[in-house]
Curated annotation (Swiss-Prot):
Belongs to the metallo-dependent hydrolases superfamily. Uronate isomerase family. Keywords: Isomerase. GO terms for molecular function: glucuronate isomerase activity. Pathway: Carbohydrate metabolism; pentose and glucuronate interconversion. It comes from Photorhabdus laumondii subsp. laumondii (strain DSM 15139 / CIP 105565 / TT01) (Photorhabdus luminescens subsp. laumondii). InterPro entries: Metal_Hydrolase (IPR032466), Uronate_isomerase (IPR003766). The gene is uxaC. This is Uronate isomerase. Transmembrane segments: none annotated.
Amino acid sequence: MKNFMCDDFLLNNETARQLYHEHAADMPIYDYHCHLNPREIAENRRFDNLGQIWLEGDHYKWRAMRCAGIDESLITGKQTRDYEKYQAWAETVPLTLGNPLYHWTHLELRRPFGISGILFGPQTADEIWHQCNEKLAAPAFSARGIMQQMNVRMVGTTDDPVDSLQYHRQIATDESFDIEVLPSWRPDRVFKIELAGFIDYIKQLEAVADVSIVAFADVLNALERRLEHFAAHGCRAADHGIENLRYAPIPDETVLNGILQKRLAGGILSELEIAQYTTAILVWLGRQYAARGWVMQMHIGAIRNNNSRMFRLLGADSGFDSIGDNNIAWPLSRLLDSMDVTDELPKTILYCLNPRDNEVIATMASNFQGGGIAGKVQFGSGWWFNDQKDGMLRQLEQLSQLGLLSQFVGMLTDSRSFLSYTRHEYFRRILCNVLGQWAEKGEIPNHKAMLGQIVEDICFNNARRYFALPGENL
């Protein structure tokens, strides 16, 4: 019987063990999509204690604590001490068996804290608290120190078009820190015309872009100025959170002007008008990304802020989101084709939150390959609720069956935590185990050099190549 969290955790055959330890374990991390706060990297934040670095902003843990019956004051309470929240988490962890949080918790204790051979829970919480806090006091456990310990080469943060990017600029000019921290363009608030805050957001966009917005062309002019600002700060990717994927044929500019002006006057748009405006913005943006060599990411299918009472209390990203079930195949097909028809579809990564859509995404990606770009349109890694063992397995198997696993750009943290880099380790172990199983069953050749190269490519090389800007030397 294998021990829990041993060196061969999740590696269930000899080929898997060789692939992981000889090829995957030491590969650098190219974390192309995350939600880290660039200010914390620029200022090299030091964390006061384990509770702070572990629980602050981590809605995965918050959801589990609520399920365990923990009082909300011990989860998000502003007056509650970090130690009290930490103790509540310690009470919760033994109840999470079968949930990836149990694995992640112990992986995060092992790396970077070096704590293994001990199960986290109420009985061990104080011992672990003191050990980790002692380490957090050292420079190697600052925000930057942890990134360096985890062999991170690049992180792509998530940034609004109105952001100044001052912290990215500060990091880029700091010669003492060699990890790339690049902005990613996230224009959700400009293409989601139906949202309550749209009018106020347009005023913000007007101010930062120095453009008066009264017509649709003014929106594009303002966005183009901000795209140039992001490009000047090294941006190479855009991301879009799309709860309800819409498509409508793009009308002429007179119609788009009318839609925008109606909305800015406080009017309520029809579903057709919303779809027309959204499609027009997304297609225009996609063409802009293609011209710049950027990667377009689409995260499709979440239902956000389901609990309106808790949304009023805590705001967004607090652990009250879930999987949607809208149909996506037809609007996605038409949206991508609207860019591709003029040969202006950018490199694209598609993520679906509902696993029933895996095959839809995998087969859709193959419709729009080309341009001499390996894996131009990608079926992205298991996202959010699929960011667990079974979800990763499903994505890997369906990608391999319906596309080319060898061209996959691999894992990302999609996290707000500096301790989440162990998710790359988790993914790598699962990847190596899958390939090892196939090889040892005789389903693929047990050719160590070939398999090792595929592992190294998926862990790092493919992403580095894929996100490179035109003419960039690797």
